[in-house]
């Protein structure tokens, strides 16, 4: 029987999930996105050719894989169409490989307008959203006024529902935020123009996945963002609007949680964060600049500069607990090449001198803590492109072993570069 594997980020996103998903899809029949929207950015490099995906699952470049967008994903029709056309121009037969749940909430222009207006109104207290309407679309879903892809298939009813929700949101835009209203007729026409095309790719995702499971076909679930951005378990309120953790698989795809076999946590050899929010191990110094420059730490979605820092084992322990991580994939080890020493945060010290090895439950709690570091020797040898443990310097191996000890979880895959072949698979999640 085929295994069902979850691949998700265990930090604040940008861990290198896209490459690993693409690599492992060689053994999967289905790749499923179950949360988030086009605020995610997954970068694939195949034979030096770079592809950045935001909404479509990373398995789309494989001809043996069906890609699924589950009900937990918020879909902006214009962004989806743009991504499809980009792939089709490169010869990828997207319509043959992509299936979508008609229960996906729609992101419409007024969601983006609200997102931007809110961030502007917050001033220096801005959360750091991508401005793509993700949060407002999830709000509409939870408040039960949101429109879904399936609503597009009844034009008359969709027009009525759209008028109701736009009346509400345009009032907020004009009266509270003092910005222009979004045009109803244009929003309606643009949405209905893509309705038939979307309908051709829609399916009952729950039924499809359960049928695949019973047939023994391996399924991969691709997470977006990272554990520390989870709406419930992340550094709230500096989080995304969906469940980025393993629990989101069941709610965002309709696949029963008892049928998941392995959870692969993706973790950088250091830490980055993009946008606002607490970050205890942040390096606002020359070493941070070195890591950020060498690691090319710029967001795939927004191009924003990421904030670099040392690996935070305290936060990673929380990620292991929340996701029941089976094993880790350690990425960007090569970025640490050349440093005289490397550090791992092993505790948080509070003003009264106490040291804790668990994370605070609210963002404000992070303001009090000072990271307690364990310092290890760095290495001058190059790890970039290494394909076996034997090729790694002793200090790098010691660093890996120490991470495993601190997290009580094995590192099953090591990535030493952006290309598919620059990877060591020590334990294959699908075996």
From Swiss-Prot:
Binding site for GTP: 13-19, 41-43, 306, 332-334, 415-417
Biological process per Gene Ontology, one example term: 'de novo' AMP biosynthetic process
Active site: 14 (proton acceptor), 42 (proton donor)
Pathway field: Purine metabolism; AMP biosynthesis via de novo pathway; AMP from IMP: step 1/2
Sequence positions that bind substrate: 300-306
Annotated IMP binding sites: 14-17, 39-42, 130, 144, 225, 240, 304
Localization per record: Cytoplasm
Entry binding sites for Mg(2+): 14, 41
Family classification: Belongs to the adenylosuccinate synthetase family.
PANTHER family membership: ADENYLOSUCCINATE SYNTHETASE (PTHR11846:SF0)
UniProt-recorded name of the protein: Adenylosuccinate synthetase
Organism: Shewanella denitrificans (strain OS217 / ATCC BAA-1090 / DSM 15013)
Organism lineage string: Bacteria, Pseudomonadati, Pseudomonadota, Gammaproteobacteria, Alteromonadales
């Amino acid at each position: 029987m085929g295994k069902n594997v979850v691949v998700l980020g265990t930090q604040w996103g940008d861990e290198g999930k896209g490459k690993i998903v693409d690599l492992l899809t060689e053994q999967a029949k289905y790749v499923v996105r179950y949360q988030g929207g086009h605020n995610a950015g997954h970068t694939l490099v195949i034979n030096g050719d770079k592809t950045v995906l935001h909404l479509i699952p990373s398995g789309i470049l494989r001809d043996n894989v069906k890609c699924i967008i589950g009900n937990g994903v918020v879909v902006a029709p214009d962004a989806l169409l743009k991504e499809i056309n980009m792939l089709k121009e490169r010869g990828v037969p997207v319509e043959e490989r992509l299936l979508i749940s008609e229960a996906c909430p729609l992101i419409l222009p007024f969601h983006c307008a609200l997102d931007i207006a809110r961030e502007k109104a917050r001033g220096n207290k801005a959360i750091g959203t991508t401005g793509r309407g993700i949060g407002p679309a999830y709000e509409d879903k939870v408040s039960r006024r949101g429109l879904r892809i399936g609503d597009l298939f009844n034009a008359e009813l969709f027009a009525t529902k759209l008028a109701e929700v736009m009346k509400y949101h345009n009032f907020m835009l004009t009266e509270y935020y003092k910005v222009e209203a979004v045009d109803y007729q244009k929003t309606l026409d643009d949405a209905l123009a893509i309705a038939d095309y979307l309908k051709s790719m829609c399916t009952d995702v729950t039924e499809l996945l359960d049928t695949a499971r019973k047939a023994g076909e391996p399924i991969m679930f691709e997470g977006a963002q990272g554990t520390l951005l989870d709406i419930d378990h992340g550094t709230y309120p500096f989080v995304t609007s969906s469940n980025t953790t393993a629990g989101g698989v069941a709610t965002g795809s309709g696949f029963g949680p008892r049928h998941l076999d392995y959870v692969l946590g993706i973790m950088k050899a250091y830490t980055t964060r993009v946008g606002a929010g607490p970050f205890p191990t942040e390096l606002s110094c020359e070493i941070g600049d070195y890591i950020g420059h060498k690691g090319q730490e710029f967001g795939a979605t927004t191009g924003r500069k990421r904030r670099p820092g040392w690996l935070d084992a305290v936060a990673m322990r929380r990620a292991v607990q929340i996701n029941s991580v089976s094993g880790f994939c350690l990425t960007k080890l090569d970025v640490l090449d050349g440093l005289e020493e490397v550090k791992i945060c092993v505790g948080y010290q509070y003003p009264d001198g106490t040291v804790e090895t668990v994370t605070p439950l609210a963002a404000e709690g992070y303001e009090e803590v000072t990271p307690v570091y364990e310092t290890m020797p760095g290495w001058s040898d190059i790890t970039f492109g290494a394909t076996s443990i034997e090729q790694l310097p002793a200090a790098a191996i010691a660093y890996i072993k120490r991470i495993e000890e601190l997290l009580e979880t094995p590192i099953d895959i090591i990535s030493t570069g952006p290309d598919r072949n620059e990877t060591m698979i020590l334990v294959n999640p699908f075996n």
